[in-house]
Amino acid sequence: MTTNTVSRKVAWLRVVTLAVAAFIFNTTEFVPVGLLSDIAHSFHMQTAQVGIMLTIYAWVVALMSLPFMLMTSQVERRKLLICLFVVFIASHVLSFLSWSFTVLVISRIGVAFAHAIFWSITASLAIRMAPAGKRAQALSLIATGTALAMVLGLPLGRIVGQYFGWRMTFFAIGIGALITLLCLIKLLPLLPSEHSGSLKSLPLLFRRPALMSIYLLTVVVVTAHYTAYSYIEPFVQNIAGFSANFATALLLLLGGAGIIGSVIFGKLGNQYASALVSTAIALLLVCLALLLPAANSEIHLGMLSIFWGIAMMIIGLGMQVKVLALAPDATDVAMALFSGIFNIGIGAGALVGNQVSLHWSMSMIGYVGAVPAFAALIWSIIIFRRWPVTLEEQTQ
């Protein structure tokens, strides 16, 4: 069934359902950032030691995105979404019951398996179900779900963790996923696999230098961001010396700014994606370099978080738009690779932040993250001058 055979209202409702699913999946990926201290206290570990959980999760997603996508390339998409949500929910129940850090990590690996499949198919499904001529808006809506995960999901998850324990945060996410699953079952039509690609697509994609350059840019800039972002909660409390409540407010502010970035990209991204992304990377570089100097003032940290959140949302959207434009004939394979590469960056950044915190000083995470951010800025200028791409261009 296509959007031509259903009303625009129903088409948008389906896209909104996917956006809610995106909110759920991104909430569970981001929420440990706000719970590291509580989890560490529960298992009598150092915060930096618990942080390795972020790297494990991200690298499992990176490793399994493409294999899982290929294994499920011929599976009807509605059925696939239902199955991955079942795994997702069961894994969160195990997170709630975790009696050791090892069990918690195992449960997070289960979530990562579901995550690996979900993000390899979501963007293409959103475009497919959107009303005619509304591809960019559909992607922006999915991105809004991502932003709301930081705006509402992460801070609410942290608040629940503060008052009811971190286990209840994961349990609540599982309940939210169950409700979303019921909505998916009711709203989505049968969705045969389309343009999913196969192993035969890989050599073709690898021979596209513009696409490979975007992938390289993605891993470098995401590494820069997560070097600092992964440990922002303990940084605010232990280095800046501010309260746990302020740390929650800062995460809320950073996520809320992401919505501003989503709006900006939704209006200008089709025509000026390259310029927006390079500008956003430059803004990220400045934010990381100023993280420690800004730590002497709540106002300074708050202002920095606003620009940081705007920058990362524009970067994430810009990378996704370019990947879709450069691989219209194998969107699922290309997005599986993108999801995997993005998570390599998350894992690498979390690991770098972990090592800096353990063996140097957590106060240096911003400066260390600024190094790959500078490299990403230079690389973005080079590749965008050589391969300018907009959403409508399907360059190969």
UniProtKB/Swiss-Prot annotation:
<feature type="transmembrane region" description="Helical">
    <location>
        <begin position="299"/>
        <end position="319"/>
    </location>
</feature>
<dbReference type="InterPro" id="IPR011701">
    <property type="entry name" value="MFS"/>
</dbReference>
<dbReference type="GO" id="GO:0005886">
    <property type="term" value="C:plasma membrane"/>
</dbReference>
<feature type="transmembrane region" description="Helical">
    <location>
        <begin position="136"/>
        <end position="156"/>
    </location>
</feature>
<keyword id="KW-0812">Transmembrane</keyword>
<comment type="similarity">
    <text>Belongs to the major facilitator superfamily. SotB (TC 2.A.1.2) family.</text>
</comment>
<dbReference type="InterPro" id="IPR036259">
    <property type="entry name" value="MFS_trans_sf"/>
</dbReference>
<keyword id="KW-1003">Cell membrane</keyword>
<keyword id="KW-0472">Membrane</keyword>
<dbReference type="GO" id="GO:0015144">
    <property type="term" value="F:carbohydrate transmembrane transporter activity"/>
</dbReference>
<feature type="transmembrane region" description="Helical">
    <location>
        <begin position="364"/>
        <end position="384"/>
    </location>
</feature>
<feature type="transmembrane region" description="Helical">
    <location>
        <begin position="333"/>
        <end position="353"/>
    </location>
</feature>
<keyword id="KW-0997">Cell inner membrane</keyword>
<comment type="function">
    <text>Involved in the efflux of sugars. The physiological role may be the reduction of the intracellular concentration of toxic sugars or sugar metabolites.</text>
</comment>
<feature type="transmembrane region" description="Helical">
    <location>
        <begin position="103"/>
        <end position="123"/>
    </location>
</feature>
<dbReference type="InterPro" id="IPR023495">
    <property type="entry name" value="Sugar_effux_transptr_put"/>
</dbReference>
<feature type="transmembrane region" description="Helical">
    <location>
        <begin position="275"/>
        <end position="295"/>
    </location>
</feature>
<protein>
    <recommendedName>
        <fullName>Probable sugar efflux transporter</fullName>
    </recommendedName>
</protein>
<keyword id="KW-0762">Sugar transport</keyword>
<feature type="transmembrane region" description="Helical">
    <location>
        <begin position="170"/>
        <end position="190"/>
    </location>
</feature>
<feature type="transmembrane region" description="Helical">
    <location>
        <begin position="246"/>
        <end position="266"/>
    </location>
</feature>
<feature type="transmembrane region" description="Helical">
    <location>
        <begin position="50"/>
        <end position="70"/>
    </location>
</feature>
<feature type="transmembrane region" description="Helical">
    <location>
        <begin position="209"/>
        <end position="229"/>
    </location>
</feature>
<feature type="transmembrane region" description="Helical">
    <location>
        <begin position="15"/>
        <end position="35"/>
    </location>
</feature>
<dbReference type="Pfam" id="PF07690">
    <property type="entry name" value="MFS_1"/>
</dbReference>
<dbReference type="InterPro" id="IPR050189">
    <property type="entry name" value="MFS_Efflux_Transporters"/>
</dbReference>
<keyword id="KW-0813">Transport</keyword>
<keyword id="KW-1133">Transmembrane helix</keyword>
<dbReference type="InterPro" id="IPR020846">
    <property type="entry name" value="MFS_dom"/>
</dbReference>
<feature type="transmembrane region" description="Helical">
    <location>
        <begin position="81"/>
        <end position="101"/>
    </location>
</feature>
